Amino acid sequence: MAAAAAARHIPIAHISGGDVTLGAADEYYRHCISKMAAVHFPSCADSAARLVRMGEAPGTVFCVGGLGDENIRTMPKMGRRELCDSTGFPLMQPFALVTYHPETAPDAGSPAAQVQALCAAMATVDGVFWLITGSNADAGGEVCTRIMQDFAAAHPDRAGFVQSLGLRRYLSAMEYAALVAGNSSSGVVETPTFRVPTVNIGRRQAGRTVCANVLCCDADRAAIEAALRKALSKAFAPVAASARSPYNGGNTSEKICTVLQNFDFAKPKIFYDGPVPEFDPQRSVLV
């Protein structure tokens, strides 16, 4: 769609450009869209600066924060008992929210082996109920989902599987979770707002700006187990509680609308080769 729009000289506004995800094929498409876009709405200062280093003019780059962060702060959450009743799982006790997707980069390892390592690590960690959601539609997703379903079926007193929680239930679960684990972007981009201890596994999100509440580890059983135990430790709790989300831009959607209403889309796109200014998602946008 972006290529067709560019060929027809239809302006493109790109949200979350400048991000890096070395373990996902999205990496290629994201940067291609950025080069075709007329205006950019990166989610954090690092991504905004990266766009300028890619040749995008600072006057076209508006660091507005993440829409996911805004959703967390504005969407009414479910009560914990309501969430418990909705899923049918014992979520009044400490629980961990787990989501794992296949890595899709050319050098990605076996998704099945990675999920098996995750399940083996979860089996050794007591004290939490594992609330597991299904994998996405990327190649290997069905295998990942089946392995996680089998784990939940084999440990019905310690784990439960839901294919999809939906946005409201997912954010509600994240709010009450003692731990978030896996390799979803939500574990990096959204958990800092909740300040929940998080384990980011493997390379799928490698390159993203990571906050203090997130521990990154390799996708092998020993590394995952060590990270899970550290994230659940009393020593890590104050570290996670100190997290300050780099994706908090305040009224992100309002900022985007303001720019779109006032931006000069008739101005020709240039390749910028100058200094990189400082960006802050908390600032008001100036067009």
Give residue spans per PLM region.
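A nucleotide-sugar donor-handling region in carbohydrate enzymes
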Residues: M36-A113, P268
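A donor-sugar binding/catalytic signature common to diverse glycosyltransferases
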Residues: M1-A2, H40, G166-A212
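Active-site and donor-binding regions of nucleotide-sugar-utilizing enzymes
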Residues: M1-P58
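Donor-nucleotide binding loops and adjacent catalytic segments primarily
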Residues: M78-Y176
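Short acidic-hydrophobic, aromatic-tinged amphipathic segments that line or gate anion-handling sites
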Residues: P42, F62-V64, F161-Q163, L215-D220
